[in-house]
Amino acid sequence: MGNTNTVYRLGPGCEVDDIAEGQIYLGKVQGFATFGTFILLNDRVKGLLHKSNVKSEKKERDQILVQVNQIRPNGNIDLREVTLPEDSYETQLVTKKITLSRLADLKNKIGRNVTIEADVVQIKQTSGPTIFTICDDSGVEDAAAFTEAGVRSYPEVNLGDVVRVFGEATRRNNQMQIEVSDMHVLKGTEADAVRARINKALEARAEPPEDVVPLIESDVLSALWPEMRKLAKIIRRAVLTQQPIILRHHADADGICAAVSVETAVMQYIRDNGGDPDQDNYLFRRSPSKAPFYEIEDVTRDLDMMLKDNVRFGQKLPLILLMDNGSTEEDMPSYKMTEVYQLDVVVADHHHPDETIDKYLLAHVNPYHVGGDFGVTAGMLGTEIARLINPAVEQKILHFPAVAGVADRSEAPELGAYLSLIDGKYTKDECKDMALALDYEQYWLRFNDGREIVKDILNLNNAPDRHNRLVTLLVTEANAAIEDQMNTMMPHVKDQVLVSGANLFLADVEMFAHRFTFPPPGKSSGEVHDILCKRYENQPVVTLGLGPDFAVIRSRGVRMNIPQMVRSMRDEMPGAGISGGGHLVVGSIKFVEGMRSEVIEKMIEKISEFPADLQ
């Protein structure tokens, strides 16, 4: 045999086709029979060492050198024992002659052994097997590995590893799955090559369709389109890689329209591109926020839930999508929390942006970035982004921009264009009714998303009769509550004329309004403002809804900059605890109750400095 012999060690995944007659292999004793000894060459190939070919006494699990005498047509392997001094041979690993399969092709290979190279995107330990969710360049599927009930298989495999999986393609509960016979982690250049291949494919699959363009003619939307495509691509990629998505949105009609449009697109995209039919329930969560910014309370809740899911279910940390909030300086504390956990954050908002927060964001869609303003509402942005994520939902959500626009009292030309799109299907008054119904129902939902109720209000459930009856009921109840509130508040509204010529009105929403019911202070202030705007037609009007430690600001015909005013007041009144912001002409301010009189006085002084558009 020469001075140095070669002994082959059969690698994982190798089969009978990978061995050759006459060669020597390193094996392991599996068991004994009267006619000989069974030898394992790896976890799936074994042969028979006839008792006439045994040269030494062995125990179960002992290593042994064997030569392949014959491979029979039925696959049985005849072996004979070989004894060699340890220093007279070298060991060479036999690797599987790999023919890689793609996850998308498993349905055509049921019952056959496959080899997959993929990224581990989730690891879930069940009471039986360990379920590895893996993602390659074609899709996502589960790989089930069993050691013993409830025991973690392949503990060396971690979330984010690139692995080579060997196993049988099966179908379980109408879902494709790989029954794992072996799995090992790829390292170095081998892993890098697989990652590069997967990333290249994901980049192409995540790219929004090129033929999707804005629904209407709009310079603002056209200028924003590249950033909207970027944001949509990030969302599509999150779905393709099984990254959970948390969608946080302002809990008003505009924010709801923005969020539900994206929710509708993403849920369908998840169902079209995933393995587990229930995964849309745990890969996507929509949560309303009371404030028009990402509060510490909200980010803390999100962090608590996402970290528990990461530990318990082996999920990736999520992508956070903020809609109708997320653009202002007030979001900064929450963004610092997301930075600690290296979370991906994207924003689609129409509040006046603060450039200091952009360093925390992967994408930021905001009309102010391209010379627009808050008239291009979050619901308009959300609908266009939803179409980029999944164009198939377009007809379902075509009325959302109009509902959002009338809800936020948009005066932008885009609103008229969106209303014309649904001419003959919904009137402007019907859009207003849906907007009011959303505001009314969300008030009672508090922090719950009310997914199915909201879908009924927006006529997404293919139940038009129920939609009409529900909206009519909610609008009737809401209008009755608003009328009662206005009858209570209006006699107590105080007025004065500012040096700028603007009419200023003070409405105390604490002392002269029903509390803890609909409409809340912000909505009540807006309704008072609407009445006063009609009463003082073509005149500049500013309305302050005053609470014990807050003020709601509504204005028309005054060139205000509320975020700038808040910053100025905070600098000038360090003991007042001032915070707040919003749009340029619509917003709110918080302060400490003990400084209420001084803050109101300073606020009136600041508002007087803004020029009024006098007729």
Briefly describe each language-model feature range:
Residues 1-117, 122, 126-130, 136-154, ...:
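Single-stranded RNA-binding regions, centering on S1/OB-family and related RNA-binding modules
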Residues 240-247, 251-253, 355-511, 528-529, ...:
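A structured phosphate/pyrophosphate-recognition subdomain
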Residues 50, 142-143, 362-372, 384, ...:
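Short beta-alpha connecting loops at secondary-structure transitions
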Residues 346-347, 351-366, 561-575:
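Flexible glycine/proline-rich, aromatic-decorated loop/lid segments
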Residues 199-243, 247, 256, 264-268:
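An N-terminal, well-structured beta->alpha segment
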Residues 391, 498, 503-615:
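Glycine-rich, acidic loop segments that terminate in or are immediately followed by a histidine
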Residues 144-146, 253-254, 268-345, 353-356:
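N-terminal small/polar loop signature for handling phosphorylated ligands or for N-terminal nucleophile
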Residues 207-218, 278-287, 506:
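Gly-rich Lys/Arg/Thr-decorated short loops/hinges at beta-loop-alpha junctions or inter-strand turns
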